[in-house]
Amino acid sequence: MALLPFFDLTNFESDASEELGWLKYVGRVQTRVFPQHFKDNLEKVRKISETIDVIVDTTAELGPEACVNLLNAGALAILVNEEMLNELADISPNRLVLKTDTTDIGKIEKLSQVAGSIQWIGSAENYPPDFFERASKIIHKAVMPEGGGRTLYLEFPEQPSMEVLKSFSVHSVVPVLSSSFLTVKPAEEPKKLSLADLILISANTDREDGLFSTLVVNELGIALGLVYSSKESVAESLKTGTGVYQSRKRGLWYKGASSGAVQHLIHIDVDCDEDCLRFVVYQTGKGFCHLDTLHCFGQASGLCQLEKTLIDRKNNAPEGSYTARLFSDPKLLRAKIMEEAEELCDATTKENVIWEMADLMYFAITRCVGSGVSLNDISRHLDLKHRKVTRRKGDAKVAWQEKLKDKGGVANTSYTA
């Protein structure tokens, strides 16, 4: 992660995609919640989390219950002070970021075992010259309990220079910067920091032409192809909100400009070794490849291909086709989903489970496509459910309890997912 933009919740109303604007291309923001507006702020965090990851500063006198509610609402992590860190000791370190101004290296080493990451506050000049180099070695020497690297953040209350930020990037310090400091149009706003320059601030390449290897994936994480990027192409991609790359022969390559297979940019990030960019995009048209396939490794398959086919059938299915009938007859579709779900439950062999699950997914995804719901929407929702730190008992509804009793089964057991 090259930077963490700070986004003021008072600027947010209802549409995360629109109101976050180009900030969503970073894939993650930080914000702050206050007790006097907690209910409203909680809903805003929930809404923004449907689109991008949010780290929430809870140090404005929020209690443990409010902190847990924010995590349940989908916050990727929360910033806490040392006192709250101790009260939330049962929460995974992956979800906790300690906010501090301590320079005690021994204390930092101890606290970093409880908080996955640490964010320092105040002016960088207030810290000893070699402090962040030493702190970085401690923070980064171990991975998180649930996987992933620990992060060292530094909050900048005033806009720093690129030279200052580069000096911190050497030690893998991630700057927390107000969104008002940033721009995707540096030529028009020369006093602000270029978002493209910040994303690439620690990226490296061993190519003589200085281009960065770039993996392009769709919203489901499926690799579409390998391309190259330059500072200019990244800047243009952020400015236009589309996939723009660097052709080694033709210069800037605006994907889809001639074919119509335009890519809508979701976000850009850099891999753990900082030598490969990843563009996450929504691919339109027939696909990414010049051979009119979704990706450069052949045809799409599995759920991705099923969704693509169903979307096409919804828009172009000939009258009388079975899929067209399903889209136009909600009672039939409902019956088929219930029928296949029951057959899946009754399946007794591995082969039967595979068969019935495939049937159920066909009808279930047809239902989703008919309602304008994508696999990516579902995937994101599953991620948010996984982030909950408190769980409901999960009993079946009464009607299904009775149905199971009729089959001689046991209706309810307590579990935690």
Swiss-Prot record:
GO BP annotations, alphabetical order: L-histidine biosynthetic process
InterPro entries: HisE, PRib-ATP_PPHydrolase-like, PRib_AMP_CycHydrolase_dom, PRib_AMP_CycHydrolase_sf
UniProt region (Phosphoribosyl-ATP pyrophosphohydrolase), positions on chain: 303-387
Subcellular localization: Cytoplasm
UniProt xrefs under Pfam families: PRA-CH, PRA-PH
Catalytic activity: 1-(5-phospho-beta-D-ribosyl)-5'-AMP + H2O = 1-(5-phospho-beta-D-ribosyl)-5-[(5-phospho-beta-D-ribosylamino)methylideneamino]imidazole-4-carboxamide; 1-(5-phospho-beta-D-ribosyl)-ATP + H2O = 1-(5-phospho-beta-D-ribosyl)-5'-AMP + diphosphate + H(+)
GO molecular function list: ATP binding; phosphoribosyl-AMP cyclohydrolase activity; phosphoribosyl-ATP diphosphatase activity
Pathway: Amino-acid biosynthesis; L-histidine biosynthesis; L-histidine from 5-phospho-alpha-D-ribose 1-diphosphate: step 2/9; Amino-acid biosynthesis; L-histidine biosynthesis; L-histidine from 5-phospho-alpha-D-ribose 1-diphosphate: step 3/9
Name recorded for this polypeptide: Histidine biosynthesis bifunctional protein his7
The organism of origin for this protein: Schizosaccharomyces pombe (strain 972 / ATCC 24843) (Fission yeast)
Gene: his7
